[in-house]
């Protein structure tokens, strides 16, 4: 078996892995980054939104008054006790510096504030309310502020985020070994992690590597939207890896950082830990198979929050849809419609088996048709058209309920309650509508496999880490020497509750933490050793 040596070996080249590599290299370590495919991971297929606040330059440019305390008090409601108060406070206090650090590494942001509530803004806007900050029950506890900092680029800008981070990695001379899958950690007799065994295609024929690269790219996108296509392409990827992969032993003199993503692409793990979440769209790549978590567990690492999955049932854009009522088959309200999509999805799955209908009247439908184009990305526009085509329409509340299979009396009661004063779910008054203009429509927004109206899902749990260093903790709570984890391979800021941008922000936060501390661990590479 051939071998290589580095100070720090990083498994995974998404946002967490890239940030870990940059920090480790800046601390003086010789770094080797591995990626099963060609880098980017789930970060590259994301929207490129980074959650930040406390007075960033972009917020100031937009005239937004925000503070570290306001950000902290809001996130405390979302995060709960998944991380300590000290860690969350440190995350919030370092938020403005995080954006500056990303900008220093070539990632562009802009303070163009989105004037309407949306799940993801159009290319005119790059700062927006990306969570439930202004929703009922939150706005009174913490001063709301837009904190979704979208990377400035067309469409879903995660690809630009990763392009710039990858460039920053390579500018530092950090070595990246693509098309290399980590298989097992190397652990010495005292439990210290000293390296990783991989299977690499680096010596495979060029045509084979090109085919593998192309298949993996198509499996990531558009395969993300067509699971059967992804499955077929991934089988071909695995055949290439089995035939041409060569085993390689890589020693890490200071540490290994697991930044290999979550496990949303591993349907068996999803079935085991979160069986109610099997009807969504796996947001990520085929490499989000839990392999990083598995390797950490095999080395003695503990896990937590594996049952936590973010399922985004967005009803915007356009923002006019927020005036509707989200109801169950009993006709009762499900949640404040202005809440973030993951909160909506969680409530629907936990309490209503993923089923729900959005009631709108003719006035809202007219606004939706008027605003859809100006408030939507192309893919959001397709979803709006799909929803309008699939809606059930009738002249009265009772008739539309019967046509949709919703209890008429329950629906009428919900509408009357929403008109009577303070909204029963706490929906802010600026989103409330009288719903008094027939005809009425009920739109099926149930969570199920549906290309026209998919429900993206992302796993949130992972390996338990030391919150000061990012070192993986054992079942006894002791840090495992030489082993670190970051991003969705680890428990982090967003592992209890997710809002847009919080996962990427945690990838930056935890990746930098793991990279910096792994670079300080143990000895360094002898310059005469076989360094990649």
Residues covered by each model-derived region:
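An anion/pyrophosphate-binding glycine-rich loop and adjacent beta-alpha core
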Residues: 293, 302-410
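Glycine-rich active-site loop/strand segments that organize a redox cofactor
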Residues: 51-91
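Glycine-rich FAD pyrophosphate-binding loop
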Residues: 26-47
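Conserved redox-cofactor binding core of oxidoreductases
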Residues: 92-246, 267-268, 415, 419-442
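N-terminal Rossmann-like FAD-binding beta1-loop-alpha1 element of flavoenzymes
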Residues: 8-33
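Glycine-rich loop(s) and the adjacent beta-strand/alpha-helix scaffold that form part
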Residues: 204-314, 510-513
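C-terminal structured subdomain/cap of oxidoreductase catalytic cores
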Residues: 22, 32, 248-249, 374, ...
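A glycine-rich dinucleotide-binding beta-alpha-beta segment and adjacent secondary-structure elements
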Residues: 410-493, 497
């Amino acid at each position: 078996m051939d071998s290589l040596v580095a100070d720090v070996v990083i498994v995974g080249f998404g946002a967490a892995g890239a940030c870990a590599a940059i920090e480790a290299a800046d601390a003086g370590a010789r770094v080797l980054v591995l990626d099963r495919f060609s880098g980017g991971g789930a970060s590259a297929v994301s929207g490129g939104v980074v959650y930040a606040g406390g007075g960033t330059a972009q917020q100031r440019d937009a005239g937004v008054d925000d503070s570290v305390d306001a950000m902290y008090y809001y996130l405390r409601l979302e995060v709960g006790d998944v991380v300590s108060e000290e860690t969350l406070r440190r995350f919030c206090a370092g938020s403005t510096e995080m954006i500056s650090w990303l900008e220093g590494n070539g990632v562009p942001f802009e303070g163009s504030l989105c004037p309407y509530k949306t799940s993801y803004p159009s290319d005119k806007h790059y700062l927006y309310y990306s969570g439930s900050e202004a929703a009922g029950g939150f706005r009174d506890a913490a001063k709301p502020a837009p904190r979704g900092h979208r990377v400035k680029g067309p469409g879903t800008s995660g690809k630009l985020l990763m392009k710039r981070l990858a460039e920053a990695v390579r500018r530092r001379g950090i070595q990246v070994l693509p098309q290399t899958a980590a298989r097992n950690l190397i652990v010495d007799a005292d439990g210290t992690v000293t390296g990783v065994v991989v299977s690499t295609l680096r010596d495979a024929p060029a045509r084979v590597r090109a085919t593998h690269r192309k298949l993996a790219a198509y499996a990531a996108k558009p395969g993300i939207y067509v699971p059967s296509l992804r499955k077929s392409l991934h089988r071909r990827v695995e055949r290439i890896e089995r035939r041409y992969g060569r085993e390689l032993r890589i020693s890490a003199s200071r540490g290994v950082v697991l930044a290999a993503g979550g496990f949303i692409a591993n349907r068996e793990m999803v079935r085991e830990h979160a069986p109610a979440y099997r009807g969504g769209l796996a947001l990520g790549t085929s490499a989000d198979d839990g392999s990083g978590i598995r390797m950490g567990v095999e080395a003695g690492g503990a896990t937590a929050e594996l049952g936590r999955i973010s399922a985004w049932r967005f009803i915007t854009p356009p923002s006019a849809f927020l005036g509707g009522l989200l109801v169950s088959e009993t006709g009762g309200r499900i949640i404040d419609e202005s809440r973030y999509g993951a909160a909506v999805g969680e409530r629907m799955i936990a309490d209503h088996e993923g089923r729900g209908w959005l009631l709108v009247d003719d006035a809202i439908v007219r606004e939706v048709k008027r605003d859809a184009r100006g408030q939507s990305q192309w893919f959001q526009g397709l979803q709006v058209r799909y929803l309008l085509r699939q809606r059930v329409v009738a002249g009265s509340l009772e008739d539309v309920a019967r046509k949709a299979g919703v209890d008429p009396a329950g629906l009428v009661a919900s509408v009357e309650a929403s008109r009577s004063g303070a909204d029963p779910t706490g929906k802010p008054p600026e989103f409330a509508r009288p719903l008094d203009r027939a005809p009425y429509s009920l739109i099926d927004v149930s969570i199920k496999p549906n290309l026209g109206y998919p429900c993206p899902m992302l796993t949130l749990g992972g390996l338990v880490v030391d919150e000061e260093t990012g070192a993986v903790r054992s079942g006894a709570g002791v840090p495992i020497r030489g082993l670190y984890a970051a991003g969705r391979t680890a428990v982090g800021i967003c592992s209890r509750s997710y809002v847009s941008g919080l996962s990427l922000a945690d990838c930056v936060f935890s990746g930098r933490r793991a990279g910096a501390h792994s670079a300080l661990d143990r000895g360094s590479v002898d310059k005469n050793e076989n360094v990649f």
